[in-house]
Amino acid sequence: MKKRILFWCHADFTYYFTAYYMSKKYESEFYAIVDTAKKPSDFYKNQNHIKFSQMWFLQEEITKNNKNLDLDYLEKIEQEYELNIWKLALNERYFHNFFNFHKFSKNEILTIEQNCCKLFEKIIKEYKPDLVITREPGLHHLKLFIQMCEKKNIQVIQLKIPIGKKLLIAKSDIAFDKIPPQNSTSNKNLTFDDFQQ
């Protein structure tokens, strides 16, 4: 059976190129959540380099005109996934002090959260990814998705901010997976050129 790999794609295309490379090397089913503005979303809709089995466009999904706020549904999600959705939303910069374009009401925030949860739950339960490849969460909806995946034992790996030509891959956004002992690597007689490489 083919592995199902989901990429959380951003405007910087790092995860798109990672998916492209992996699609050439591995027989897998590829999925994508595209978290970008309109123009980059158009690129994803029109691209033909990667055969994604399914793509979801987050901005379209979370802004659906859903006037039926269901607090019971959100409570069920909080219990099933052991989440505090309101706490995540309170820490979202777009909902509060640093976003001057729109003052979100509590109902608007909860409706957006409900739309996120419905999308994420559908992906987790219907498509059942084996692996999620993403970056460190900078916005609450990615943190929410990661927590929901972890609760259902879906492996999540995060590509950390690159340092030079190296990239750290980890399971957590707050800790390293495994740090080798200091004496396991040799750093004697290194030149400046060695450090640059």
Model-derived segments and their meaning:
Residues 10, 112, 136-137:
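Residues that cap or flank secondary-structure elements
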Residues 14-17, 40-41, 140-143:
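Short, well-ordered alpha-helical microsegments
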Residues 9-26:
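Histidine-anchored nucleotide/phosphate-binding helix
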Residues 21, 25-117, 161-197:
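Conserved N-terminal ligand/cofactor-binding loop architecture of enzyme catalytic domains
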Residues 2-12, 34-36, 133:
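Nucleotide-activated donor-dependent transferases that construct or modify glycoconjugates
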Residues 118-181:
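Conserved nucleotide-sugar donor-interacting segment of glycosyltransferase catalytic cores
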